Amino acid sequence: MMMLDDYIAKSKLSESLTSTVWLAKHKLTGEEAVMKCFDLSKLNRNLRDCLNNELEFLSSVDHPNIIRLLHVSQDDDFLVMVLEYCDGGTLSSYIQRYGRVEEDIAKRFMKQIGAGLEIIHDNHIIHRDLKPENILIDGSGDDLVLKIADFSLARKLHPGKYLETVCGSPFYMAPEVLQFQRYNEKADMWSVGAILFELLHGYPPFRGNNNVQVLRNIKSSTALPFSRLILQQMHPDCIDVCSRLLSINPAATLGIEDFPFLGRIKNSRVWVKDTTFSSRQHGTRERKVATINGRLQFDLSQDAYLPQRLLENLMYIYNTIEMARVTGVPTSYLISRGESIKVLSQLLRKAKQKTWFFQMLRSWNLNKELMKVQLYVGGFISPTYSFTYSSITSNILINISNDIYSHC
């Protein structure tokens, strides 16, 4: 039986080429913990850097949705980390046991994952391996607490910088990672979108036997592969979030700063405002969330972000149109009840004051119906003016998005 200071290893949980994980117990209190023992001789320079990043980050944070580091010990041959023990297993085992979950549970889980990820990204860390297996559950019943764990692939990533190493788990890897392109923290957000989709469906959105097959399935999809039955039961805001997290264009992928679950929760089928959120357990920082009628109000005060916002919301509408075409769900229902059409209205009202917007508007080759939509949501014409969404084509929206992207 392995011993370390105040902890005794009881039973082996797992073993890899570089480490062994034990279930441990504190000798005095009897409190259970997890002991990870690393063989330093088997760690290359890159793995040592990742381990150092993990230790540096975990030793500096104390947040209920991030696994807690209790103790570290090192000699010439081994390094041992003692982490808190979560008796609820992993989110993966939870999904295997219970299958898909209801939206209110998924949103509650997403709020906790988002809270932990906000701290991670605020510390300029990219996790790179977010998946249900690396999210631990503590507690039982209605008091489940989710904790992001396993930072073995995490790296420091300062603003404006990118990574290029391909790593992670294929079902949850962003397409830019799978394509050997450079990536930033938005890759973590794609992983969160895949987890949200799996919570709602019981399986990941894109699967395959290897990275190539997963990427091929992503690129060949004209819409997110929602189950038609489940899609009919989903709140439009939930469809909105899935579409914006799982955008194949990283520039259009929802960022943690706009992650809606940090500012609103679902009660029955109504989004309810949650005006404050304490990002750290001991209240070292507080995130204020402005709301309009209980809904998240996006910050439109910074002109520099205007093209980016337009791009994100137009790409959502594009994804929605494609989804409607495949599933047969009326496009007008998805768009008119979705959050993005309301945000797009705010954005266009602000954009119409900009010279570049008018130049772009004149350059677009729009059909009459689409022009009516643009003028309506932009506040140029009366909302009583009739129009239909059916004539908005994907190609037109792609062209619009490309124009806006050039201003980002």
From Swiss-Prot:
Any one GO molecular function term: protein serine/threonine kinase activity
Active site residues of this protein: D129 (proton acceptor)
Pfam families: Pkinase (PF00069)
Binding positions for ATP per the UniProt entry: L13, S14, E15, S16, L17, T18, S19, T20, V21, K36
Cellular localization per UniProt: Cytoplasmic vesicle, Autophagosome
Recorded family membership: Belongs to the protein kinase superfamily. Ser/Thr protein kinase family.
Name of the molecule in the record: Serine/threonine-protein kinase ATG1t
EC primary class: transferase
Its EC number(s): 2.7.11.-
Keywords, ordered alphabetically: ATP-binding, Autophagy, Cytoplasmic vesicle, Kinase, Nucleotide-binding, Protein transport, Serine/threonine-protein kinase, Transferase, Transport
Coiled-coil parts of chain: none
